[in-house]
Amino acid sequence: MESLLLPVLLLLAVLWTQAAALINLKYSVEEEQRAGTVIANVAKDAREAGFALDPRQASAFRVVSNSAPHLVDINPSSGLLVTKQKIDRDLLCRQSPKCIISLEVMSSSMEICVIKVEIKDLNDNAPSFPAAQIELEISEAASPGTRIPLDSAYDPDSGSFGVQTYELTPNELFGLEIKTRGDGSRFAELVVEKSLDRETQSHYSFRITALDGGDPPHMGTVGLSIKVTDSNDNNPVFGESTYSVSVPENSPPNTPVIRLNASDPDEGTNGQVVYSFYGYVNDRTRELFQIDPHSGLVTVTGALDYEEGHVYELDVQAKDLGPNSIPAHCKVTVSVLDTNDNPPIINLLSVNSELVEVSESAPPGYVIALVRVSDRDSGLNGRVQCRLLGNVPFRLQEYESFSTILVDGRLDREQHDQYNLTIQARDSGVPMLQSAKSFTVRITDENDNHPHFSKPYYQVIVQENNTPGAYLLSVSARDPDMGLNGSVSYQIVPSQVRDMPVFTYVSINPNSGDIYALRSFNHEQTKAFEFKVLAKDGGLPSLQSNATVRVIILDVNDNTPVITAPPLINGTAEVYIPRNSGIGYLVTVVKADDYDEGENGRVTYDMTEGDRGFFEIDQVNGEVRTTRTFNENSKPSYELIVVAHDHGKTSLSASALVLIYLSPALDAQESMGSVNLSLIFIIALGSIAGILFVTMIFVAIKCKRDNKEIRTYNCSNCLTITCLLGCFIKGQNSKCLHCISVSPNSEEQDKKAEEKVSLRGKRIAEYSYGHQKKSSKKKKISKNDIRLVPRDVEETDKMNVVSCSSLTSSLNYFDYHQQTLPLGCRRSESTFLNVENQNTRNTTASHIYHHSFNSQGPQQPDLIINGVPLPETENYSFDSNYVNSRAHLIKSSSTFKDLEGNSLKDSGHEESDQTDSEHDVQRSLYCDTAVNDVLNTSVTSMGSQMPDHDQNEGFHCREECRILGHSDRCWMPRNPMPTRSKSPEHVRNIIALSIEATAADVEAYDDCGPTKRTFATFGKDVSSHRAEERPILKGKRTVDVTICSPKVNSAIREAGNGCEAISPVTSPLHLKSPLPTKPSISYTVALAPPAHDLEHHANSGASRPSEAEPRGADNEKVMHEVNPIRKDGRDKESPSVKRLKDIVL
């Protein structure tokens, strides 16, 4: 039995389900089968019973226990139950009614299968007797009914295949009676049926046949020899035929079991009784018990074990020593009593008997191990109770034949990574026996912890103007998980800071959590910003958490105060006060803005230089007031240097020159009190708004009326200034193409064209030649006086520039009102056309005073500001007398970045667009500032190359355009944005707008040194011109707007004193390039007098002073004549002239 129970002690894998699965499978096989006989397919039957078997695993079953491992076994891979050798049931189970082999196997899915194989008996053995002959002696005194037990036949087969009956040779004296023992075996007794008479017959011979229950039955025979002896009248007699006795299993040897006593009334040897085991008493029983033949005491001779056998039957006979003794028989049944002599046995079924691993995410009720506890004792001695020792998050759940260890709480590896479990089992016997089994449970890690920041809110303070890449702070998050589950990486959550991604402000090291600044912060733009940092682990799926980081930017004194009031021009403000101002009179209010905060942005005011004795300034509000009174003897102007400085640790300041002029005294009522500046400001704004509104309505109505005549724009060259002028004179945009390509060739055509010239064109002509109220020689020009002709190649390095027409200054002109030649316009010869007088087209003429420039560069400039070309670069160098604020404005100009919006836009609608040149009503206001800037600015320019394209076709023209006419797309620019390509293929447009002079208008010029020449003053002798130089001049006259500011006149007068500018109305400009590789270009600023003045001075050549006379007087004379004309033309500008100026500008 011990060998059969040893496999139960094997340890197996952990059961995965919450309750262990257990099934019972029963099979049967007949004995005497050869080795390898397949009993059953356990895998198939287990799968049908609900087992989850993994076909991918090589080993599906494992035997836990096997009561006959030498006879049967299970194939672990196929699950077939097979025999290992020939099974002899008669030898294995002897006479047991059932012969069963038990196996317990566990599948790969941790499920238990109990298999019982019943060995079916075959009738393969015949009954046999222990001896070949049975000899009996029967006293003749034996009365009928006397029973004499016979030796039983033995049949190894069991059940119905064992001995079932006995047969005796038929006779009249003796018979057989069949009886059954307690173990089911049958035996026969010989019964005397009639009285015997030794004298009649003393010897009998019979045959006894034993039959089993087979079909056909097997049989065994034995001879029976009966000898009739003389009688012993009394036989021993037992008190009872059956005795029952019990003995503890732990009884030592020689322990008495029972004392038998059989009485015999005879005397002597006939009454002396002898005891012995008789009949069928197996050898094992004879090993355990013995009987004293004289006393009849039955004692224990071997070790009793209740678990091995708990009932034994002893057949005892007693006979006297007399002759013809007839023995007496009795049966003693010995019951072995169970004692608590076996402690419980604990078997742990898991993957590893010493170490069990379970995930910390295992839910309550999860099975981690299977426990089987056994006790060989019976009853209360074998009733076992199990429990887990200690306070652990596990519990033991008991079932009928096994127990499971379940998770009974939340497991947390971070708090407790392993447990030592002890299982204790105890029985209920007396004394109580117990046993214990210990093993280790290791908790495996799961990604169940989020990264945890050391604090949810971080704040860092950094000064503005920090270095990009500067370290700000570090964030830290901890994850108590292990391995990748505990590795933390950082990233910034996408967000916006001032409409910009936060990634443009800061970055984070994903491993260390260090945060760095990606830009230099500006407190004035961003005082503080927040963003979130995300920390996530490396588990699957990853867990994450975030923290908020706030960056506070401290202000530093990095902004210089900017004086905003009074308005400054080149750092100078002019203020007018009445001469009769009293003490405390408010002269002006100085205002300065500082974008810093706190003390860094608090501005105070002071006067550092100038006439401080006459004025004082309030340091807080910047009010400049008088400290003295003024009279008629006071000087007309005063100067103050006003300084605005902040209160930062390193104070920054800005200064301005305030020029205070004394104006005529105010009336008494006007001089009382200070002027209400707010009221004046409101009235001025209202007036300007009203004027602008009326102007817009007038322009809209006018444009709408003009556009209703025809709404097609088929001229690809109308984007140039020259073409716009020609189209404007004709008054019809649709015929712009004809204004370039068509010119009358006959006087009849000239007259028809001259009749069509509108009043607008006449006013333009009048304005272009000057306007005189009282002159009777006023000469008008018609459309026939203006013709666009191809410019000669040798003059491509010269450009006539239209002069300015307004005296008003504005610093914003350079920023927003620069004219450009549309880059999309085709560079054809029509781009380089001159306006030519039809009447003097073939006559010899000379230049009138005009702006010209000479260049040796390969290209022409892209930008023209009031007729003066600017270089392509956006950064300029200025002379020392040019103020820094002007340079700042030009460098920061947005005009160079958006030329398309101001130069190329034409919507094609009836009304002008807001960015069209016709819509810009303030363009003339910026002229003088531009002229002054040009007079003080040095720039460089590139030359141009003459393209070879057809003058009437645009970039988008096709062959159909020559037949059907041009469409809107023909004049559209090729590139929407101007590029600054310096390739030779990218040619520029230069507009030369000239009007030929008549022969009477030819001017004289004089040499200035051996190499330089400039135009002579009015009234010089025409004969002074050398004949060989006349053809070079081409006789063209610039259509210039001749109204300029007094500053320009003074500059011209100063320039006229030198040899470089002999003419009083010309002044050379030298524009210097910031790039040393480009050649410098010389410009000549010219003011054209009216045509009749030219004739007047040309005809009065005899009365002119000689060349040796001083030229200053001649200059003054001309200027006296020119200035009234210029003033008169400025006072009586017509709307057409204004529009012409807008177009030209």
Swiss-Prot record:
Ca(2+) 2 binds at E31, D90, D121, D124, D157. Residues 901-921, 1094-1145 are annotated as: Disordered. Ca(2+) 5 binds at E140, E199, D230, S231, D233, D266. Keywords: Calcium, Cell adhesion, Cell membrane, Disulfide bond, Glycoprotein, Membrane, Metal-binding, Repeat, Signal, Transmembrane, Transmembrane helix. This is Protocadherin-19. Calcium-dependent cell-adhesion protein. Pfam families: Cadherin (PF00028), Cadherin_2 (PF08266). The gene is Pcdh19. Ca(2+) 1 binds at E31, E32, D88, D90, D124. Residues 1-21 form the signal peptide. It is a single-pass type I membrane protein. Ca(2+) 8 binds at E249, E307, D338, D341, D377. It is found in: Cell membrane. Ca(2+) 14 binds at E464, E524, D555, V556, D558, D596. Residues 906-921, 1106-1145 have a biased composition (Basic and acidic residues). Disulfide bonds join C93-C99. Ca(2+) 10 binds at E360, D412, E414, D448. Ca(2+) 7 binds at E249, D305, E307, D341, N342. CDD domains: Cadherin_repeat. Ca(2+) 15 binds at N557, N559, D594, D596, N600, D646. The keyword Phosphoprotein does not apply. Homodimer; antiparallel. Residues 22-678 are extracellular. One of its GO terms (biological process) is homophilic cell adhesion via plasma membrane adhesion molecules. Ca(2+) 4 binds at E140, E199, D233. Ca(2+) 13 binds at E464, N522, E524, D558, N559. Glycans are attached at N261, N420, N485, N546, N570, N676.
